[in-house]
Swiss-Prot record:
Amino-acid positions noted as binding Zn(2+) in the UniProt annotation, renumbered to this chain: H181, H183, D194
Entry-linked NCBIfam families: PRK00024.1, radc
Keyword Nucleotide-binding carried by entry: no
GO MF annotation terms: metal ion binding; metallopeptidase activity
This protein's name: UPF0758 protein SRU_2338
Residue span, MPN domain: 110-232
Organism: Salinibacter ruber (strain DSM 13855 / M31)
């Protein structure tokens, strides 16, 4: 069966022309993926357009969101998607996550509840395959003024210690901090080590005059507040 290449389609049907003429919101999910992929490919059955590759990815994973959660190696399981195309997609989705997180940070958001912090940092942490421990710095009005990554790859008292948590907070003149880390397993329940470290940091913060308002665990789209659990007084 002969497949008509995209460049031979009617201009009004070509994803690039549709975007330039009508804007990105008119594009289907398959067309958005096609523009990110950049081009189609050739298989033993003949040429496959970028839009067809986009449809194949959506069929494989069910939705654009699910495609965005996949690692490059997983994306290459779809026929016609090689490492180059897979890394393009992964980079584009990561850019989107960073833009959303930075947009909320740029608004100098005031923290009124744990969900506020989860909304800002969840997109950056929830899809990682290793644990990352971050500290969010707040001013006296509970507005986010900065953040600092303390450790990557695991959570233990030898990696997360008070000095590493509060040193940068002092330099930023933070009035308080909120700690957070992710659980790649997707389980938002705190471990014994999570609770122990939280109490250790809260005690150190009280001594230094930089209180720890909360410690959030990000797990997928869920989060747990250890302050709400009563771990932090």
């Amino acid at each position: 069966m002969y497949r008509v290449p995209i460049h031979e389609w009617d201009e009004s049907d070509q994803p690039r022309e549709k975007l330039l003429t009508h804007g990105p919101t008119v594009l289907s999910d398959a067309e958005v993926l096609a523009l990110l992929l950049g081009s189609g490919t050739r298989t033993s059955d003949g040429p496959v357009s970028a839009v067809e590759l986009g449809r194949a990815l959506l069929q494989s994973y069910g939705s654009l969101h699910e495609v965005s959660q996949r690692k490059p190696k997983e994306l290459t399981r779809t026929r016609g998607v090689g490492p180059a195309k897979a890394t393009k997609l992964a980079a584009a989705f990561e850019a989107g996550r960073r833009v959303e997180s930075q947009r909320q940070q740029d608004e100098r958001m005031q923290v009124t509840c744990p969900a506020d912090v989860a909304d800002v940092y969840g997109p950056l942490l929830r899809d990682l395959d290793k644990e990352v421990f971050k500290v969010v710095h707040l001013n006296t009005a509970n507005v986010i003024i900065g953040d600092y990554t303390v450790s990557e790859g695991g959570l233990s008292s030898s990696v997360v210690e008070p000095r590493g948590v509060f040193e940068q907070a002092i330099l930023d003149d933070a009035a308080a901090v909120i700690c957070l880390h992710n659980h790649p397993s997707g389980n938002p329940e705190p471990s014994r080590e999570d609770i122990r470290i939280t109490r250790q940091l809260a005690e150190a913060g009280g001594t230094m005059g930089i209180p720890v308002h909360d410690h959030l665990i990000i797990a997928g789209t869920k989060h747990t507040s250890l302050a709400e659990r009563g771990v932090i007084d």
